[in-house]
From Swiss-Prot:
Keywords recorded for this protein, A-Z: Antiviral defense, ATP-binding, Cytoplasm, Disease variant, Endoplasmic reticulum, Host-virus interaction, Immunity, Innate immunity, Lipoprotein, Magnesium, Metal-binding, Microsome, Mitochondrion, Nucleotide-binding, Nucleotidyltransferase, Nucleus, Prenylation, RNA-binding, Secreted, Transferase
S-geranylgeranyl cysteine lipid attachment residues: C397
Residues annotated for Mg(2+) binding in this entry: D75, D77, D148
Cross-referenced InterPro entries: 2-5-oligoAdlate_synth_1_dom2/C, 2-5OAS_C_CS, 2-5OAS_N_CS, NT_2-5OAS_ClassI-CCAase, NT_sf, Polymerase_NTP_transf_dom
Gene Ontology BP, a term: type I interferon-mediated signaling pathway
Predominant cellular place of this UniProt entry's protein: cytoplasm
Protein name from the UniProt record: 2'-5'-oligoadenylate synthase 1
Expression by tissue: Expressed in lungs.
Subcellular location: Cytoplasm; Mitochondrion; Nucleus; Microsome
Species of the source: Homo sapiens
Length: 400
């Protein structure tokens, strides 16, 4: 693979296409592996349980679910929504027993040779794991596929297009998280909303997210522990929403804008109101508290208890220093050696929520309030043509 830092700015789209986009064969392999595990969860896993267990749905999460998988990253997150889990506390208290049962059944299938595949179950790292991790391999798969299966409480039920959760779901989440002191612990319950947050985004924005993720992973190899990758994905969405909003844009400019946001991490206060807002008094009070926390504040658009920016000032400082160094590399230089410009980010919000409360009082760098995605402009940018379109998938396995 060509070194990203030495890739000319004008060639970043080609770099993404040549090295980061998963090819059709790779996607087919991953989907085949997912079908095997989904079938197992549906038909076999809880068939002999001592009490009824209904799997209401299995949802593909993580990068695979969002459509931002990097080439060569053979992993998949499957969130299994189970009927016995009726509260967030149930999920916390009982997920271990369901993980143990899934593991037991996988190992039984392995002994019985029920599948033409091999499961290599990973030992949990702590006593109450959030996920069962294993590797699935077969002759049909070119390489092993790493799985994380996460039991979850079905807080949302069946979703429809344009779904916005009943505020009482978030009231319940806030109250239980506060009582348990487990803020951000139940983001898996909102996997579908996290996926849908990116689902309708332009293909090229997803390519920019892939580029930022590739940069982040290079930094992580060098620096070690860093803020969560999801925070960088959200920063990329924020940069595009406030600086471009076009389906075709200059990739180097977008990339530089994201790195400048990282450099200015101590000024970041970013959140969205697509799924929750300030209209309910309990949610409003909680959001006010979240938004006055030390910067950076980057709230999960699907889960107001999840602050992706908090808890790792050292990691942000290291990442910012690395970003500053990167701005001097060829990937941010024009053909004449001048630096690529970044997007000018709009600082004002047109959110209807401003009538109820003035969230901009919390703003240092930015605020996002989105209810509906706008109609994207299809006018090509004069700066740079779009890369080859990618096939996108929306994947939910609903168990009837």
């Amino acid at each position: 693979m060509m070194d990203l830092r030495n890739t000319p700015a004008k060639s970043l789209d080609k770099f993404i296409e040549d090295y980061l986009l998963p090819d059709t064969c790779f996607r087919m392999q991953i989907n085949h592996a997912i079908d095997i595990i989904c079938g197992f969860l549906k038909e076999r896993c809880f068939r002999g349980s001592s009490y009824p267990v209904c799997v209401s749905k299995v949802v593909k999460g993580g990068s695979s679910g969002k459509g931002t998988t990097l080439r060569g990253r053979s992993d998949a997150d499957l969130v299994v929504f189970l009927s016995p889990l009726t509260t967030f506390q149930d999920q916390l208290n009982r997920r271990g027993e369901f993980i143990q049962e899934i593991r037991r059944q996988l190992e039984a299938c392995q002994r019985e040779r029920a599948f033409s595949v091999k499961f290599e179950v990973q030992a949990p790292r702590w006593g109450n794991p959030r996920a069962l991790s294993f590797v699935l391999s077969s002759l049909q798969l070119g390489e092993g596929v790493e799985f994380d299966v996460l039991p979850a409480f079905d807080a949302l039920g069946q979703l429809t297009g344009g779904y916005k959760p009943n505020p009482q779901i978030y009231v319940k989440l806030i109250e239980e998280c506060t009582d348990l002191q487990k803020e951000g612990e139940f983001s898996t319950c909102f996997t579908e909303l996290q996926r849908d947050f990116l689902k309708q985004r332009p293909t090229k924005l997803k390519s920019l997210i892939r580029l930022v993720k590739h940069w982040y992973q290079n930094c992580k190899k060098k620096l070690g522990k860093l803020p969560p990758q999801y925070a960088l994905e959200l920063l990329t969405v924020y940069a595009w929403e406030r600086g471009s909003m076009k389906t075709h844009f200059n990739t180097a400019q977008g990339f530089r804008t994201v790195l400048e946001l990282v450099i200015n991490y101590q000024q970041l206060c970013i959140y969205w109101t697509k799924y929750y807002d300030f209209k309910n008094p309990i949610i409003e009070k909680y959001l006010r508290r979240q938004l006055t926390k030390p910067r950076p504040v980057i709230l999960d658009p699907a889960d107001p208890t999840g602050n992706l920016g908090g808890g790792d000032p050292k990691g942000w400082r290291q990442l910012a220093q690395e970003a500053e160094a990167w701005l001097n590399y060829p990937c941010f230089k024009n053909w004449d050696g001048s630096p690529v410009s970044s997007w000018i980010l709009l600082a004002e919000s047109n959110s209807a929520d401003d009538e109820t409360d003035d969230p901009r009082r919390y703003q240092k760098y930015g605020y996002i309030g989105t209810h509906e995605y706008p109609h994207f402009s299809h006018r090509p940018s004069t700066l740079q043509a779009a890369s080859t379109p990618q096939a996108e998938e929306d994947w939910t396995c609903t168990i009837l």
